[in-house]
Amino acid sequence: CLQWGVFLLPILPIFGSISIFLGMILSYRHQFKSIRKNPVNQGLAILSILLVIISILANNSLESFLGLFNFIPYFIMFAGLSEIIQTPSQLRQLSWLMIFGAIPVIILGLGQQYLSWSGIDILQGILGWSLQLNGNPVGRMSSVFMYANILAAYLIIIFTLTLGLLIEEWQNKAENNDGYILNKNQKITLLIITLLLTAIDLILTNSRNAWGLAVLSSLAYALYLGWWWLILLVTTGVTAVLGSAFAPSPIKDGLRMIIPAYFWQRITDENFVRPVETLRITQWKFALNLAQTRPLTGWGLRNFTPLYEAKMNVWLGHPHNLFLMMFAEIGIPTALFFMVIICWILSQGFLLLTNSLTNPSERLVYYSYLITFLGLILFNCFDVSLFDFRVNTLSWIILSGIWGVVDNTIGNSTKNSYN
């Protein structure tokens, strides 16, 4: 069920979510005792209670209770799925399924931008999406997602996992028994094509955030593998692009003859005149002010938007920073408690990578999940992706896999110590 759900989620989110839900239910049915005793799940249960209390005390309780659906169902899903995703081999299979599921998204995005594809509105109730002509905002690829930045967050997941699988297949002389009919060369070819098309789509989302994260994920693999030549190459390229945007005039002018204007114009934002109310720095200051005004309980989930609109006369769905949003909406103590849980999971993941995983192929697959989730964290420093059901679901599945492998390893070590 879970595998079908992961595959179908991007293009058929309703059917994908049902499959994932059924997989989660089966996990609870067979592993409820283990789920209940897991310390991370206990922490998430406490966090859920705190969020309910905060919603009762919120400035707008109705909005805050609606906001619970962006958190508590995913805590429940995490607890169930981390009991059934427990090996690097399973992570590899899920990576392949995410990549196969992304291919239609990538193709539809290219059609949207270059072939003026649009519509399918009549099937929106079944598909859960429609294709907007020339993207949203116009000129920025959004494919099957509501907005270009959400597509960018999704593509960062696909780009990072695809790059990890490509490196693994390239290095691995033996065939992986992953259950697919493709041979090694066919898999490498498919991964290269998918990676290139994903990179093109990332560029066409016009998301500076995603561009930077694609570079950082590439550097993360290069550092892990000790590929200093690639680090030098990427660093040189990034320096040239940034120089074309911000270097002093003689240097900048020369670099702009080499670097396409598409990049440095977007980085400098010089083609856009933005009202002060729409600037990220303005939103961040407002969110900080909200956090300082009600530091203990916050203003309630989804309360940033009406408060900002009342003050600035501009509607914004979020302050373009997940952490500042949480400080403002659920209070500093609860937000920090949430962050501690996530940091604990990731720290245990890196300890597992360092101390317990010995198979190079398994280490690389697990590492790809760690840096994918870290990439999502960095993405949410300049945007907020949790309001999109599909990206949020994939994010929690990735975290479930990270913790599931840790929990399984700890369990096996405990059993061995008693034998």
PLM feature spans:
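Transmembrane signal-anchor hairpin modules in multi-pass inner-membrane enzymes, especially those
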Residues: 1-66, 76, 86-92, 96-99, ...
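Alpha-helical transmembrane segments of multi-pass inner-membrane proteins
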Residues: 20-23, 49-52, 76, 92-137, ...
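Transmembrane alpha-helices of multi-pass inner-membrane enzymes
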Residues: 22-27, 215, 367-419
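A membrane-periplasm/extracellular boundary helix in multi-pass inner-membrane enzymes
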Residues: 107, 113-116, 204-205, 222-271, ...
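Long extracytoplasmic/lumenal interhelical loops at the membrane interface
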Residues: 270-330
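Hydrophobic transmembrane alpha-helices and their immediate junctions
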Residues: 330-377
